[in-house]
């Protein structure tokens, strides 16, 4: 690990609730001592999209002074700043128009690439991506209630990123669009099992899908991960080292080993596509969790309200049409990428 570290924290966001999530994370960084470490400089990169939920720039840039005082540098990446930067790159012959469009235009991949670019420009050593619908905590399931615990996400990544190109943490909560389906004569469990088995691979398996569905669409944290400091190297499966796009740290000290993000037009999957580029990179799974609140059920968590049970993502046949189609699209996208690079 370097003696003096410039740590970047990147958010690609478009939600009005971003400020609340940011506050929770910054107080988490203070609680674990990172905001007071003189050899660690915290640099915040916020790439925001005003069209996603009809927000204003001030929804992202108007950060409370008590929070900014705990951060060393802050970079807000809006459309205007990015367009000026793209123009400079085009005029300087650094990128062609086609390359700039591929890299900086369209979807979450473009927002993540903007953060990557400004992090490299500011000589950031390590860059951590966090999502605006994830919180630094883990939830486990006991016999009668769920149990909550705080997680030192940044601190855990910092402990291990010096020995890797990428470190990736774990996720709990609502991490996939797979609902709890009420099977019936029209859509039987056996029908759905046969479909899953038809597209299955090392990542998509019926036993995993059934387990998530059995928990009402909720993924609980693995207690063995929480009670040990075990770090695992991510092995390559069918040409991919599968990672997620958040709770993700990238070692920027050797820029030639850093890969950009990509997603197809009007689609997601930027983390899966990046996974296919990592054959020559060392990727570690590190022992920290974030809770994914995909349906915004649990914003009160950030005010200290800890529920004793989690809502099930129910889906009877009346709603299963769209929900199952969404699940199928998600699984089919993953399967397509795996097949392309097999």
Description of each model-found segment:
Residues 130-131, 285-293:
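Catalytic beta-strand/loop signature of glycosyltransferases that borders the donor
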Residues 54-122, 146:
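Active-site-proximal specificity loops/subdomain of glycosyltransferases
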Residues 127:
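Short aromatic/hydrophobic "clamp" motif used to bind/position activated sugar donors
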Residues 267-273:
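Acidic donor-binding loop at a coil-to-helix junction in glycosyltransferase catalytic cores
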Residues 12-15, 49-50, 54-56, 292-296, ...:
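Terminal low-complexity segments of carbohydrate-biosynthetic enzymes
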Residues 1-62, 92-93, 98-99:
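N-proximal low-complexity "stem/linker" segments adjacent to membrane-targeting elements
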Residues 136-256:
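Conserved catalytic core of nucleotide-sugar-dependent glycosyltransferases
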Residues 20, 52-60, 100-104, 137-150, ...:
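Short, flexible/disordered intra-domain loops and linkers
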């Amino acid at each position: 690990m370097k003696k003096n570290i410039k740590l970047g924290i990147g958010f690609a966001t478009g939600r009005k609730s971003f400020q609340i999530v940011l506050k929770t994370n910054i107080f988490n960084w203070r609680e674990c001592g990172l905001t007071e470490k003189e050899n660690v400089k915290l640099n915040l990169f916020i790439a925001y999209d005003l069209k996603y939920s009809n927000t204003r720039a001030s929804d992202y840039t108007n950060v409370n002074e008590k929070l900014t005082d705990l951060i060393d540098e802050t970079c807000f990446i809006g459309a205007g700043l990015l367009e000026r930067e793209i123009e400079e790159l085009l005029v300087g012959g650094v990128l062609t128009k086609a390359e700039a469009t591929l890299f900086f235009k369209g979807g979450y991949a473009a927002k993540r690439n903007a953060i990557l670019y400004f992090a490299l420009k500011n000589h950031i050593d390590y860059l951590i991506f966090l999502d605006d619908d994830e919180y630094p905590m883990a939830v486990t399931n006991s016999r009668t209630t769920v149990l909550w615990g705080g997680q030192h996400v940044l601190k855990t990544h910092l402990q291990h990123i010096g020995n890797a190109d990428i470190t990736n943490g774990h996720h709990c909560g609502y991490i996939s669009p797979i609902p709890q389906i009420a099977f019936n004569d029209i859509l039987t469990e056996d029908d759905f099992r046969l479909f899953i088995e038809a597209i299955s691979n090392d990542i998509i398996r019926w036993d995993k899908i059934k387990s998530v569905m059995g928990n009402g669409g909720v993924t609980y944290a693995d207690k063995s991960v929480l009670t040990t400091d075990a770090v695992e190297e991510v092995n390559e499966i069918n040409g991919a080292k599968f990672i997620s796009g958040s709770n993700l740290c990238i070692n920027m000290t050797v820029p030639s080993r850093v890969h950009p993000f990509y997603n197809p037009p009007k689609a997601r999957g930027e983390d899966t596509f990046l996974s296919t580029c990592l054959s020559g990179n060392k990727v570690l799974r590190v022992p920290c969790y974030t809770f994914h609140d995909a349906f915004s059920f649990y914003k009160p968590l950030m005010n200290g309200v800890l529920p004793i049970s989690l809502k099930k993502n129910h889906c009877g046949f009346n709603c299963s049409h769209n929900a199952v189609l969404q699940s199928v699209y998600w699984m089919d996208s993953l399967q397509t990428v795996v097949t392309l690079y097999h």
